[in-house]
């Protein structure tokens, strides 16, 4: 079934159901981490861009934080550079960082900005290096109980919220590539999941949405019957050690955002067309909702 096959009455019911959520979110910031298949499938990319324009025209303030893992990996392969992951994070040498900067801002960010701007002059591409938007602090990861160095990888230590709010006040949609200098000016690669959480916390966002390539959070992956629709931060912290490595940054991001005051974080299936609108404006939603304990 598509929207074209719905009866006029059914379409009206869909719009009426959205009213409650439109009222709740009007004038509020929603931070969306854009990644996974939604970045590589043309239909999903265009649907995501349309969703951002829809939010903007409903008086909601979307802020997009994007990754670029598949594109970085592809470019590293073309250049003959070996890549590695530890604890769900990309090991970033100076050589890998150069590629990440080129791909994140020069390719992925530009493509998304152009797709959104096909609907109007809304999107502005920035990195954490612009206007001192982010300040990074270097991080390690825990691998089998051992703190492990992963190179030029950081967490967001500070967000220049005023700079982002200036863009929002100008009715723009910030599209953020996750690169940021530390206090000494050394640029780091920032995981987009953890960066999105820092942005949501700093802006006092109403919601944080994480796009993934699965239906949501599973308590016992790959058992699909273990999908949870809602979980609180206490239960999620207990679940964290058992999660698949690639899900760890997303869960860490959800925990940071919700414990930092964001009312809810949502891990949603980015393979679903218009997944952002489904999650925000329908009673059923899609994926897993994380709330405070």
Curated annotation (Swiss-Prot):
Protein name, as recorded: Acetylglutamate kinase
EC number: 2.7.2.8
GO cellular component, one term: cytoplasm
Site (Transition state stabilizer): 33, 250
InterPro entries cross-referenced by the UniProt entry: AceGlu_kinase-like_sf, AcgluKinase_fam, ArgB, Asp/Glu/Uridylate_kinase, Glu/AcGlu_kinase, NAGK-C
A Pfam family that the UniProt record links to this protein: AA_kinase
Reaction equation(s) it catalyzes: N-acetyl-L-glutamate + ATP = N-acetyl-L-glutamyl 5-phosphate + ADP
Pathway: Amino-acid biosynthesis; L-arginine biosynthesis; N(2)-acetyl-L-ornithine from L-glutamate: step 2/4
Organism the protein comes from: Mycobacterium ulcerans (strain Agy99)
UniProt-listed GO biological process terms: arginine biosynthetic process via ornithine; L-arginine biosynthetic process
Domain of life: Bacteria
CDD domains (UniProt xref): AAK_NAGK-C
Function text: Catalyzes the ATP-dependent phosphorylation of N-acetyl-L-glutamate.
Gene assigned in the entry: argB
Binding site for substrate: 68-69, 90, 189
Alphabetically ordered keywords of this record: Amino-acid biosynthesis, Arginine biosynthesis, ATP-binding, Cytoplasm, Kinase, Nucleotide-binding, Transferase
């Amino acid at each position: 079934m598509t929207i074209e096959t719905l009866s006029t009455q059914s379409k009206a019911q869909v719009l009426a159901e959205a009213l409650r959520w439109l009222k709740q979110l009007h004038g509020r910031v929603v931070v969306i981490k854009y990644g996974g298949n939604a970045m590589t499938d043309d239909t999903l990319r265009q649907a995501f861009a349309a969703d951002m324009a829809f939010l903007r025209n409903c008086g909601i303030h979307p802020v997009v934080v994007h990754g670029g893992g598949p594109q970085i990996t592809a470019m590293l392969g073309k250049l003959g550079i070996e890549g590695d992951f530890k604890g769900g994070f990309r090991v970033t040498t100076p050589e890998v960082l150069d590629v990440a900067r080129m791909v994140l801002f020069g390719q992925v960010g530009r493509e998304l900005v152009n797709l959104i701007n096909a609907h109007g002059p809304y999107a502005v591409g920035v990195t954490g290096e612009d206007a001192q938007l982010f300040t990074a602090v270097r991080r390690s990861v825990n691998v089998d109980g051992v703190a492990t160095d992963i190179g030029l990888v950081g967490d967001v230590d500070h967000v220049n919220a005023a700079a982002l709010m200036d863009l929002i006040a100008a009715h723009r949609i910030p599209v953020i590539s996750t690169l940021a200098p530390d206090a000494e000016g050394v640029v780091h690669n920032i995981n987009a999941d953890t960066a999105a959480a820092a942005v949501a916390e700093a802006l006092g966002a109403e919601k944080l949405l994480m796009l993934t390539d699965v239906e949501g959070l599973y308590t016992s992956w790959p058992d699909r019957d273990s999908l949870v629709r809602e979980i609180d931060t206490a239960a999620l912290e207990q679940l964290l050690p058992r999660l698949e490595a690639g899900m760890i940054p997303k869960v860490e991001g959800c925990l940071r955002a919700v414990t930092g005051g964001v009312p809810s974080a949502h891990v949603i299936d980015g393979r679903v067309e218009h997944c952002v609108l489904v999650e925000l404006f329908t009673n059923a939603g899609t994926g897993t909702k994380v709330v405070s304990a």
